[in-house]
Amino acid sequence: MEESDTTKYVIHAHISAEGVVERPDVVGAVFGQTEGLLGADLDLRELQKTGRIGRIEVNITSKYGKSNGNILIPSSLDKVETSILAAALETIDRVGPCISKITVTKIEDVRSSKRKQIIDRAKHILTDMFDNSVPESQEITDAVKAAVRVEEVTFIDNLPAGPNVLDSDAILVVEGRADVLNLLKYGIKNAIAVEGTNVPQLVAELSKKKTVTVFTDGDRGGELILKELLQVADVDYVARAPDGKGVEELTQKEVVKSLRSKVPVEQVIEVPQGRRRNKLAAQAAEKQAQAEAAQKAEAPAAAAPVQPQREYQQKEYPQRESRERSEQPRGEVPRRKSLRRTEEQQERPERPERSERAERREYRERREYREPREPREQREQAPARKEREPSEFDEMMKELSGTLSARLLDANKNVINTVAVRDLANTLKESNGDVKSVVFDGVITQRMLDIAAEKNLETLVGVKMGSVVKQPAGVKVITTE
C-alpha cells in the first residue's frame, strides 16, 4: 500500500459480493456511488487529486461464485472527516451487476504506530550508543578542567594565588596551594596562600588595602595560622572549614556554606597578643575586686547568726540538765510517789519541746528581720557592683538579643537602617554622617570605638566591652552587662 507522507489514518473495510467481481469494479463503485453524496469538500476524486487521501488498495478473491476481500483507504483528514468517509463506504450496495456489502472493521491511527517505533528505536539508541561514550566524554571534560585550573594558578612573590587577587577588592587567605586549586575549581579566583605559619609581608600589605577573609582548615594548624595573621595583618572576617577537614577537601556546597558563615574578626575569641595581655590583666583585676567585695559582704552575714545560735545552745543545755536532774532519784521514796514521778516525767517533756519550738521560731524571725539589711551593707562596701541604671535603649537591646543584628539611629533616635553585626563596620564607614547612635547585639571593640569617634557618633550600645585600650571622650558607651 502506497501512503502519502502526511497520512494520519487508514480505513480498513471488508467487502462481500454475490458474484464474481474484480479490483477495478470495486474501485469504480467506491468513486461512483459516493460522488456527490458528501458535497464538494469530501468528494473522493477531489480529495485524491489534492493528496488528502491516498491510493485505494483492494484485495479480493472469488470462490464458488462469490467474492470476498479487503479495502484500505489512507487518509490525511482529521478524525471527523475520516469517520464520515468510512460511513459513506458502507452505503455502497452494488459492485457492477452484483449485490455487495461493505463493512468498516477498524480505523488505524498511523501516528500511534510511529510513536511505538520511535520508542523502540530510542531504547536501542540509549542502551547501545550512550553507555560507551559517557565515560570517555567524562574523562575528556575532567582533563580539560584540570588543565584550565593549572593554567589559572599564578604566583605573586612565590605565593600561589588566583588570577584576580591583585584586581579584586576582597581576598581570601588560605593555607596552601591545594586550597587555592580547590577554590579555583569552584570559580573562586581571589584566593592567596600563605604557605605555612610564617605569614609573608605581601599578605600583610594586601590586608591594608583590601577586605581580607581568612579561610582556615578545621584543625590545630588552622588555629595557629589564624593567630599569626591576627598579629601581623588587618583581618576583617574569619571563615573556618568543618572540624577535621581541610579547605582542599571541601565540596562546592561545603565551601559556599563555610564562606556564608564567616564572622567579623571582632566576634572571634582570639585577639592579638598585646590586646590579649591587656584583656587578661583586666579580667584578673575584675575577678580580684569581685572576690574582695564578696568576702566583705559575706563577713556580716556569717557573723550575725553565730550569737543567736550560742544563746540558743546556752538556753538549751540548762533545760537538758534540768530534765536529767529531774529524772535522777534523790533517794528512796514510796512506790506511789515514784509512779507519780514517772507520770510527771512522761508529761514534762512536752513543755520543753514547745519552748524549743518557740525559741527556734523566734530565732528564725530575728534572722529574717536582719537579712534584708545585708544587701545595703554589701552595696555600701562594694559600690562597684551597683546595678546598672536603666537606659532608653534597653527595650531595643531586648529586641535585638540573639539576632546578631545592629540598628543605626539618627539624632532623634529613629531607626535609619538595620544590618548584620558582621557588616556594621563597613556600613558605618560608608555612612554620610546622619548616624548618631548604634545599638547592636555584639561586643564593643577598640576598632568599633575608633570608627564611632571618626564618624562623630554620640552613643554606642552593645552587650559588653571587649579589649579596649583607649575609649574616645566624645562617645558614650552603654552595655547591658
Curated annotation (Swiss-Prot):
Residues 275-393 are annotated as: Disordered. GO terms for cellular component: cytoplasm; DNA-directed RNA polymerase complex; exosome (RNase complex); primosome complex. GO terms for molecular function: DNA-directed RNA polymerase activity; metal ion binding; poly(A) binding. Residues 281-309 have a biased composition (Low complexity). SUPFAM superfamilies: DNA primase core (SSF56731). Its cofactor is Mg(2+). Coiled coil: none annotated. One of its GO terms (biological process) is DNA replication, synthesis of primer. Its EC number is 2.7.7.101. Mg(2+) 2 binds at D217, D219. Residues 312-393 have a biased composition (Basic and acidic residues). Residues 169-243 form the Toprim domain. It catalyses: ssDNA + n NTP = ssDNA/pppN(pN)n-1 hybrid + (n-1) diphosphate. It is an enzyme of class 2 (transferase). Signal peptide: none annotated. Binds two Mg(2+) per subunit. Keywords: DNA replication, DNA-directed RNA polymerase, Exosome, Magnesium, Metal-binding, Nucleotidyltransferase, Primosome, Transcription, Transferase. Pfam families: Toprim_4. Mg(2+) 1 binds at E175, D217. RNA polymerase that catalyzes the synthesis of short RNA molecules used as primers for DNA polymerase during DNA replication. Also part of the exosome, which is a complex involved in RNA degradation. Acts as a poly(A)-binding protein that enhances the interaction between heteromeric, adenine-rich transcripts and the exosome. Belongs to the archaeal DnaG primase family. Forms a ternary complex with MCM helicase and DNA. Component of the archaeal exosome complex. This is DNA primase DnaG. The gene is dnaG.
